Amino acid sequence: MALKPPYSPESGGASRSRTQTETVHFWEYLESLLDAADCTSEAQVNSALVAYVKTASERYGEYLVEDRDFYRVALLLLRAPLYERNKSFCISKMLSLLSIDLLEMSMKFVISYILLCECKADSSSLDHVLDYQGFTVIYNKLYEHFAYLHRYSDDEETTFEANITELDEEINEELRKISTVLLDLLFQILKYSKCELANLQRVDDFFVYYMMVSLRSDTVEDMYNNAKFRLLLALNEQYMISNHKAGLENKVYAYLMNHTASKQFVELLLLQFNRTVDKSLQIMMCKIIYLILTSRDEIAMDYFYLNDLHVVTDVLIRNLTNISEDEEVLRNTFLRILDLILRKTEWTQSHYREQELLELLEYLCSVDNLCSSGNVKSEHMSTTKLAFKCRQAIRQLKVEQKKSRDAAAAPAPRPKTPEPRFERTDSHMSVPMDKITRAIGRSPFASPPPPPPSRRV
């Protein structure tokens, strides 16, 4: 016998707390909506799915409060035979519902959460999402939310200061909550599926700009903040890949070069780089740093504050020391970043932890220190080459520094006496007087000859 709904709208709705009995009845009723025996056609599957999502959405904030409640809703559906036999259709239907403009926020959240759980549980489902224009649907919803928050929230320091009421803030908080799930879903698509160029071209300047300027750099605990940061990393990675194929402009890099827009992002990047243990995110952050340090020399030299540069150096030393043998690719990535820091930043003046770096690089230059099993791989050889290159950069810098010191300490050379234009000789002083007399026909000391006689007229 079919169960009745937990309560009717006339019974007080969400205004009163529910008893344990009512809570149990709610979950039993919700599960009964997915009874596969009653669904033999696509239309019946459609009706059952819509009823399930609608019922869960109506109890949002009442029976569904904590993250575990929403996870249970998702798990009940994803494990139901009705869903497993009609997965592609169910995904297309949920995306269709999500694309509705005036869809209630509670239903947006429930659908987004179910789709995210599905894609994390089975990465092949990302293909189904993309087949049914999922990228466009998710991107458009996020764009709508960003446009609203840009205008009516205080997410940005430059936002127009409107009179934000308590109701406005409640709406903003719900939009951030839904956006957190959608951002994570879009991250899954960009990170773990083949991103079509057309989808990447759809991302416009405002979308990237809003995520960058609305970041907070004082926390790593805010889920909405972290979701925006991760999506920017994933977008940058896709731009770097597509640049080799189609020369598509990297919008993330463009705003990185705008210090006003990227200030919060760079501060959060350094904070996350120092704290995160997720290897995938570490590599993605290294790609951002690599882009910055391979810019023009004057940009790379002055982009990071000296203290921030020292933090990056500390993190690199720590990670290079602690990486295990099976993570040699990650060590190679860190060494490439270190090489750029040693050659193209203010480290060339500070020489921060120089001796420790030399000792570490000396250790990494030997394959025997990297591979205890004796099974030397190409990654191990790359590590030794990169370590040698970094070590040479430090040694070359020390040689140049010594030359500069020696040149500064050497005494200044004495100025040379300028050579006369004409050489002076005194040889005429030694010529005998009689020779001079004979040459001119008279003594140079005799009286001058008389004047010539006057001409007669």
Swiss-Prot record:
Query: InterPro entries from the xrefs?
Result: SPIN90/Ldb17, SPIN90/Ldb17_LRD
Localization annotation: Cytoplasm
One Pfam family recorded for the sequence: SPIN90_LRD
Keywords (alphabetical) are:
Cytoplasm
Compositional bias (Pro residues): 446-457
GO MF: Arp2/3 complex binding
The GO biological-process annotations, alphabetized, read as:
actin cortical patch assembly; actin cortical patch localization; endocytosis
Q: Where is this region: Disordered?
A: 401-457
Annotated transmembrane regions: none
- GO CC terms in record: actin cortical patch
Q: Where is the composition biased (Basic and acidic residues)?
A: 416-427
Q: What does this protein do?
A: May be involved in protein-linked oligosaccharide phosphorylation.
* Annotated family: Belongs to the LDB17 family.
Q: What is this protein called?
A: Protein LDB17
Q: Which organism is it from?
A: Eremothecium gossypii (strain ATCC 10895 / CBS 109.51 / FGSC 9923 / NRRL Y-1056)
Q: Which gene encodes it?
A: LDB17
